[in-house]
């Protein structure tokens, strides 16, 4: 068991350092740092259960059992969330007939969309070109490290790639997925005809959460699934798990 914790510590340290340089994966460094701390604490508790006096051994044994139970719960819930992500990662036939396509932001690089965001824009463009009566709503405000609102960069990309500007509306105030959808709904409630239909456009890993938030906002939980860069999928799945836990913990799920 002691060897297992040394392996976990080394793996967490290595993966954390690998994720640190990129803004896209940097958040995962915090998770892997937590793994290192967990492994170190469990290693210490294990030693105390074997070598300390009786009172310390009892306390260490209790804390060690709690650590094992917590890790088991995380593993089980993580696996369950991943199954839900897989079940949601598809395009619904109804999306082809949706009047409004909500494209969720995913970061920009100077005046160009990130690779992840580009796949969402490509999926939205293709769907919109198959349904000439649809309107695209690009969602995303301006981050502290960004020179432009994401929505503006998204609109420019779509226009450059064949979507008429008059078919695009911008929601440029939001800073997260919840606001993406909520602020887009405000625009639709003001300007769209009664009974309008919607579809959300995002990467497959993101659609479990996006569908739920769409339904929560009173919009159609219909989706267009964009492909995800294969090398980033593990990190994105980890992020979605953390987001799901945070939403549940803050009573927003």
State each model region's role.
Residues 233-253:
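A transmembrane-helix-recognition feature enriched in membrane-embedded lipid enzymes
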Residues 3, 23, 44, 54-55, ...:
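Short alpha-helical segments used as structural interaction elements across diverse proteins
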Residues 3-50:
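Membrane-embedded alpha-helical segments of integral membrane proteins
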Residues 39-89:
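Transmembrane alpha-helices and immediately adjacent membrane-cytoplasm interface residues
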Residues 79-237:
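A structural signal for short, hydrophobic/glycine-enriched beta-strand patches
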Residues 28, 58-63, 233, 237:
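Hydrophobic, aromatic-rich alpha-helical transmembrane segments
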Residues 7, 11-14, 70-76, 80, ...:
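Lipid-exposed faces of alpha-helical membrane segments in multi-pass integral membrane proteins
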């Amino acid at each position: 068991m002691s060897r297992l914790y040394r392996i976990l510590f080394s793996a967490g340290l290595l993966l954390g350092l690998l994720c640190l340089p990129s803004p896209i994966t940097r958040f995962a460094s915090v998770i892997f740092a937590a793994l290192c701390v967990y492994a170190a604490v469990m290693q210490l508790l294990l030693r105390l259960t074997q070598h300390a006096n009786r009172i310390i051994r009892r306390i260490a044994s209790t804390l060690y059992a709690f650590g094992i139970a917590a890790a088991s719960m995380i593993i089980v819930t993580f696996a369950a969330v991943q199954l839900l992500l897989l079940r949601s990662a598809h395009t619904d036939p109804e999306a082809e007939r949706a009047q409004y396509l909500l494209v969720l932001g995913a970061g920009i690089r100077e005046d160009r969309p990130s690779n992840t965001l580009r796949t969402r824009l490509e999926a939205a463009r293709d769907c919109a070109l198959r349904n000439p009566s649809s309107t695209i709503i690009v969602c995303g405000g301006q981050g502290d490290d960004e020179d432009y609102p994401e929505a503006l960069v998204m609109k420019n990309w779509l226009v450059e790639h064949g979507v008429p500007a008059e078919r695009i509306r911008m929601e440029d105030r939001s800073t997260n997925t919840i606001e993406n959808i909520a602020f887009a709904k405000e625009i639709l409630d003001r300007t769209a005809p009664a009974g309008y239909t919607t579809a959300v456009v995002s990467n497959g890993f993101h659609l479990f959460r996006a569908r739920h938030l769409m339904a929560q906002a009173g919009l159609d939980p219909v989706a267009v699934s964009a492909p995800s860069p294969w090398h980033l999928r593990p990190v994105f799945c980890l992020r979605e798990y953390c987001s799901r836990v945070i939403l549940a913990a803050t009573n927003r799920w």
